[in-house]
């Protein structure tokens, strides 16, 4: 499939998914602050057990969504990253520089702001990575509202930036949010990875064997202490993109099959399950607490400063150029939109502040929702204003 048609399909799916995410989050907030809140919380706490022989996995429904279904989301991210690295925007070093610099700035500055506001509280510092994330579906959904007033190059810049950001989130989760490790489970996971790599090298193109071993890998990683969603990324990196014969690409086949399910099912379900913040007892002072404040300011101000600042620096030093047809006002608007952390921030928050085990569980959602909403509204307004006269400013 040509790059442009692949990007167009990706953008349309992500944009529509972003709008659906908004609806799912609003619905969760309404239900959990209504007389039906008992039903909402009871449903998420429902125990679900999967057992095959002596192997038993028992978790509440919420964790099946966060550990199980989100592994498919990370599988999709892994497929997208591999495709982009081998045959897309990330395969061309000259096109990586600008979004790469922007992504690095967009992760470092929010983390520093959160650290500064919470530096005297070691327990709160566990949430430092929450404002480093960008919700690509939500951000592209807002950008899609501007239609053709925004150049395709700017949309591609945001998409590439967000993919690099997701890759950074994967590394952060693997290094900083793993529990106590099980040597046996890690050994079995390593054996699964070796089998996947061997199949790739031997030219196996049928998806069935990859998915079966991938499921076993997920169970091993789940039991190992490393977060289970990383099994999805590992599986994705082992699925071949190219084939020796004229057979369809296994990677593209799986990506195209999985994308609608993730965009229209898994992500909205995750948003519904995790965005239901109870507003009972919440006051203005609640939002000024150092944890939600650090997250909200990190997302809104940190992302803007980091993304725009590193983009400006890369262009001014001559190592990169502005996206074709875009102006600095539009770049500023996109930088603000990168502060929409939402699903990715909620996911990292669920690892940093485990519900029922951390006093800050729930506070993170206040900061995420506040920062993301303001980033969406302000980012849209700035991008719309800058797009009225869509001419590139001198760089």
From Swiss-Prot:
> Which regions form coiled coils?
none
The membrane topology term of the UniProt record is: Multi-pass membrane protein
What catalytic activity does the UniProt entry give for this protein?
A: Na(+)(in) + 2 H(+)(out) = Na(+)(out) + 2 H(+)(in)
* TM regions (residue ranges): 11-31, 61-81, 96-116, 127-147, 156-176, 179-199, 215-237, 262-282, 295-315, 334-354, 366-386
Q: Which terms does the record give in the GO molecular function aspect? A: sodium:proton antiporter activity
Main subcellular localisation: membrane
Q: Where in the cell is it found?
A: Cell inner membrane
Keywords of the record, alphabetical order, are: Antiport, Cell inner membrane, Cell membrane, Ion transport, Membrane, Sodium, Sodium transport, Transmembrane, Transmembrane helix, Transport
GO annotation terms (biological process): regulation of pH
Which domain of life, per UniProt? Bacteria
Question: InterPro entries under this entry?
Answer: Na/H_antiporter_dom_sf, NhaA
Please state which protein family the record places this protein in.
Belongs to the NhaA Na(+)/H(+) (TC 2.A.33) antiporter family.
Protein's UniProt name: Na(+)/H(+) antiporter NhaA
């Amino acid at each position: 499939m040509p790059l442009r048609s692949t990007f167009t399909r990706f953008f349309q799916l992500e944009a529509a998914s972003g709008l659906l995410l908004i609806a799912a989050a609003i619905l969760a907030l309404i239900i959990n602050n209504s007389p039906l809140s008992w039903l909402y919380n009871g449903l998420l706490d429902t125990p679900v057990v999967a057992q095959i022989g002596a192997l038993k996995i028992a978790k509440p429904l919420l964790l099946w969504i966060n550990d199980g279904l989100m592994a498919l989301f990370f599988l999709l991210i892994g497929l997208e990253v591999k495709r982009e690295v081998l045959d897309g925007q990330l395969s061309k070093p000259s096109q990586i520089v600008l979004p790469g610099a922007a992504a690095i700035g967009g992760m470092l500055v929010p983390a520093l702001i959160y650290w500064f506001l919470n530096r005297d509280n070691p327990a709160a510092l566990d949430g430092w990575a929450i404002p480093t994330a960008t919700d690509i579906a939500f951000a592209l959904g807002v950008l899609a509202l501007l239609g053709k007033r925004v150049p395709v190059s700017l949309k591609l810049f945001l998409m590439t930036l967000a993919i690099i950001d997701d890759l950074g989130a994967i590394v952060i989760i693997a290094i900083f949010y793993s529990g106590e490790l099980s040597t046996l489970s890690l050994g079995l996971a390593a054996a699964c990875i070796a089998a996947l790599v061997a199949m790739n090298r031997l030219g196996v193109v049928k998806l069935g064997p990859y998915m079966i071993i991938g499921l076993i890998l997920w169970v091993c990683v789940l039991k190992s202490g490393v977060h289970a969603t990383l099994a999805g990324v590992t599986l994705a990196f082992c699925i071949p993109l190219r084939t020796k014969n004229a057979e369809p690409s296994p990677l593209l086949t799986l990506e195209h099959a999985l994308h609608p399910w993730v965009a229209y099912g898994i992500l909205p379900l995750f948003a519904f399950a995790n965005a239901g913040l109870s507003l009972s007892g919440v006051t203005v002072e609640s939002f000024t607490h150092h944890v939600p404040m650090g997250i909200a300011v990190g997302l809104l101000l940190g992302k803007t400063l980091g993304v725009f600042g590193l983009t400006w620096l890369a262009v001014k030093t001559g190592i990169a150029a502005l996206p074709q047809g875009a102006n600095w006002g539009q770049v500023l608007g996109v930088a603000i939109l990168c502060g929409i952390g939402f699903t990715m921030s909620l996911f990292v928050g669920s690892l940093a502040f485990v519900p029922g085990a951390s006093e800050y569980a729930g506070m993170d959602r206040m900061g995420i929702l506040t920062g993301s909403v303001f980033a969406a509204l302000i980012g849209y307004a700035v991008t719309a204003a800058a797009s009225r006269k869509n001419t590139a400013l001198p760089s």
